[in-house]
Amino acid sequence: MLVVPAVTGFTVPSASAACPAVEVIFARGRLEPPGAGQIGNNFVSGLRSKTGKNVNLYAVNYPADNQIDVGANDMSARVQSTMAGCPNTRIVLGGYSLGAAVTDVTLAVPFPFFGFNNPLPPDAEQHIAAVALFGNGSAWAGPIGAFNPVYRDRTIELCHGVDPVCNPSDPNTWEANWSDHAAQAYINSGMVKQAVDFVAGRL
């Protein structure tokens, strides 16, 4: 007869045991190699140091060329899977350049639109703690809070110097000012740290 000794103090881990305190879902800029990009990685590294929390980084899976809808569908899917599997995890959305546009669509379009066919459910706002956008071309149309007021106070949008993507200007000056759009310019200027401080205060 096989006797199994009693084990005391053992608890079966729940699904939430493996859940991070914070899930950052970040979309890289146009033509950056797969991953979260320089700004995304720098932002998450800073957030981990600032908060001391378990911060997971999910890099939005999309080509980062012109297919904003593909990125928005993936970002939305990740938000929804995090909500379902880790309901207590605080979600942070972010993006740089084209990735900021991906985030705009995810948050501002509540219905299927062209190739975007996976809109967020209404209760997503209860899980999304903050949004950080860098070099966002939406400045030409208005900030994300103008399209979805729920996120107005949760969003930080940063535009470096005369970055022509987020600073509407004469097209003739774009080439001369393009260096202000570089990811490293945002990092070196302290704007990524500024976003870290903002987001940390909302977690």
Where are these regions (language model features)?
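Short mixed-charge
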Residues: F113-A130
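Gly/Ala-rich beta-loop-alpha elbow adjacent to hydrolase catalytic centers
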Residues: L93-G99, T103
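Extracellular/periplasmic catalytic domains that process cell-envelope and extracellular macromolecules
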Residues: A18-C19, G85-C86, P122-Q126, N148-Y151
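Secretory targeting and sorting signals
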Residues: M1-S16
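Surface-exposed loop and adjacent secondary-structure segments within mature catalytic domains
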Residues: A146-N172
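Extracytoplasmic/secreted cell-surface and envelope-processing proteins
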Residues: P33-A36, I68, A101-D104, F114-G115, ...
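Active-site catalytic motif of lipid deacylating hydrolases and related acyltransferases
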Residues: A18-R90, V162-G201
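Active-site nucleophile loop of the alpha/beta-hydrolase fold
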Residues: I128, A132-A139, H160-P164
